[in-house]
């Protein structure tokens, strides 16, 4: 699921596939009709989930799935070979949980430090990216290459926090400010994403990648922390809503 795979069967006999939708579009007979359900998914979710794409008859391979195609046979359903196990884990105390989390984080970072190209990290100053940078600093001898993107609107600018983390771990730190009206990238991003994708951080993410590329080839990031540990306010509101629902009679 880390790398996307797009595919389509043209005229029932030709398989075209690639890691980007634009690669498939190089085929002159690729279907170009918009898939209405994909448009509905986009407006509901902000993106188009697998296996659909914006084009009818063009599909994405689901994460953790395989697809076996045989000549002369219909396209089978995608086969799931792995998924995240959601089994309860028996842990004695909260301290044990914290120790396990730190060990897993350190292991994950250490695995990704094995590379033949220069490495760095995106640093926002938040808990997620700061934890990754801290682990990198503990696991490697050379200073970590970090980069941060700030905004010219003070309430959204977090570079001060990133700078403090960089100072704490002695990183080689780069910063750049993105203007609030930096819309020059819209056409570029539309071409890169290949299909509708609503992400308010798309522009700063592209800019921080540009900044990182000045020094490194691969950069680690702290994505996923808020989703896994309920860091957004919407999770708190959802929890309160569920508590309220549980207190009310089912008839209401």
Question: Which residues are covered by each model-predicted region?
Answer:
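Cysteine-centered catalytic environments shared across enzyme families
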Residues: 2-195, 205, 209
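Active-site adenylate/phosphate-handling loop in enzymes that bind or generate adenylated species
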Residues: 207-252
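Donor nucleotide-sugar recognition loop
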Residues: 197-200
């Amino acid at each position: 699921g880390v790398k996307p795979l797009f595919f389509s069967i043209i005229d029932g006999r030709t398989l075209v596939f690639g890691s980007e939708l634009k690669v498939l579009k190089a085929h002159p007979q690729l279907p170009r009709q918009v898939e209405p359900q994909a448009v509905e998914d986009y407006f509901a979710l902000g993106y188009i989930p697998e296996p659909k794409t914006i084009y009818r008859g063009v599909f994405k391979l689901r994460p953790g799935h395989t697809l076996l195609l045989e000549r002369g046979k219909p396209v089978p359903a995608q086969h799931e070979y792995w998924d995240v196990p959601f089994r309860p884990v028996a842990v004695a105390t909260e301290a044990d949980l914290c120790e396990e989390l730190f060990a897993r984080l350190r292991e994950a970072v250490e695995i990704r430090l094995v590379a033949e190209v220069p490495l760095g990290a995106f640093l926002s100053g938040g808990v997620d990216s700061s934890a990754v940078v801290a682990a990198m600093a503990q696991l490697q001898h050379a200073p970590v290459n970090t980069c941060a993107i700030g905004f010219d609107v003070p309430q959204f600018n977090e570079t001060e926090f990133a700078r403090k983390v960089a100072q704490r771990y002695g990183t080689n730190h780069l910063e750049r400010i993105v203007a609030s009206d930096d819309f020059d990238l819209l056409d570029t991003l539309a071409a890169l994403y290949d299909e509708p994708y609503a992400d308010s951080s798309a522009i700063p993410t592209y800019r921080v990648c540009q900044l990182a590329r000045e020094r490194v080839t691969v950069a680690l990031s702290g994505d996923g922390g808020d989703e896994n540990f309920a860091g957004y306010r919407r999770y708190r509101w959802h929890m309160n809503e569920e508590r309220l629902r549980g207190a009310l009679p089912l008839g209401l």
